[in-house]
Design a protein with these regions (language model features):
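Cys/His-rich short segments
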Residues: 3-72
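Long, charge-rich boundary regions
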Residues: 53-106, 110-111
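Catalytic cores of large soluble enzymes that bind and process phosphate-bearing ligands
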Residues: 19-20, 48, 52, 70-71, ...
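Generic beta-strand/beta-sheet core signal
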Residues: 1, 8-10, 38, 47-49, ...
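DNA strand-break repair and replication-stress modules
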Residues: 105-253
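Generic structural "secondary-structure junction" signal
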Residues: 9-13, 24, 37, 54, ...
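Conserved NTP-handling cores and scaffolds of large molecular machines
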Residues: 11-15, 64-67, 86, 124, ...
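Structural motif
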Residues: 1-3, 217
């Protein structure tokens, strides 16, 4: 059960007069773009989009995270180091990394470099629903990505679908449709997808199962797994229409 704290009031008597009124910054911490409040959203966002250096870094971190492709060894610190040494600039650059590049980095040893290359190569075999989630399209998390793949069968067909096609799917909101349509209009996003497909990512779901007993259900995998690893179970669940999250919530089945 989620515990949501309630603010019942302020402790005015604790104030000594040194407090200052807080004002929302008008400029992104990157220093290049203004901060905008999107209509109907309470979260401020940088107007620079993917041109914002901070947003770009965070998108790469999310892409490689457990919620994304779960590239073992591709931590936030590793990504920051790769960016600092200009080894990557976009998410697709991850799949052009070579052992020879990594071994030259400070404090990188043979095993660390080899393991990361192996993890990167393994992530290319991720199912299309996981790749779709990793792209970080607003409002498209694991559950929605699975739902889209189940109904269309491939990432390319999802991108080709119009609003009317998407509206027919139970569970796909207007916010998802609008976000997906906006994302498709950015040429850089489509170039990224093309590059990922060239690197070997499978965009088409094989043996898509819509009416599976796992379809639409959310799972959390914990504990020690024998005779298999966590990623194998994730792939099995996702191929059968389910989704996997990292923590238990009210949506967990």
């Amino acid at each position: 059960m989620d515990v949501i704290p309630e603010v019942v009031g302020s402790l005015d008597k604790k104030r000594d007069g040194s407090q200052n009124k807080w004002n929302m910054p008008s400029t992104c911490p990157c220093g290049e773009f203004k901060i905008n409040f999107i209509q109907d959203e309470k979260v401020p966002r940088c107007s620079g989009g993917t041109s914002c250096k901070i947003a770009k870094k965070e998108s790469i971190i999310f892409f490689a995270s457990r919620t994304g492709l779960e590239i073992d060894g591709m931590s936030k610190e590793t990504i920051e180091s790769l960016l600092t040494f200009d080894l990557i600039k976009e998410v697709e650059d991850i799949f052009s990394l070579k052992y020879e590049d990594l071994i030259k980095l400070p404090q990188w040893e043979d095993k660390k470099a080899s393991n990361l290359i192996t993890s990167i190569e393994k992530s290319i075999k991720s199912p299309p629903s996981r790749l779709l989630t990793a792209l970080g399209i607003r409002f498209i998390g694991k559950r929605t990505a699975n739902l889209l793949i189940q109904n269309f069968g491939s990432i390319n067909k999802i991108l080709d679908a119009n609003s009317e096609d998407l509206e027919k799917i139970h569970g796909i909101s207007v916010s998802v449709i609008n976000s997906l349509n906006e994302w498709k209009l950015v040429e850089k996003n489509l170039l990224t997808l093309n590059t990922l497909q060239e690197k070997g990512f499978n965009f088409e779901e094989i043996n898509t199962v819509i009416d599976s007993e796992l379809s639409g259900k959310t799972f959390v995998i914990t504990g020690t797994l024998q005779n298999s690893n966590r990623q194998d179970f994730i792939n099995l669940i996702e191929k059968n229409g389910g989704s996997v999250t990292t923590s238990i919530s009210k949506n967990t089945d």
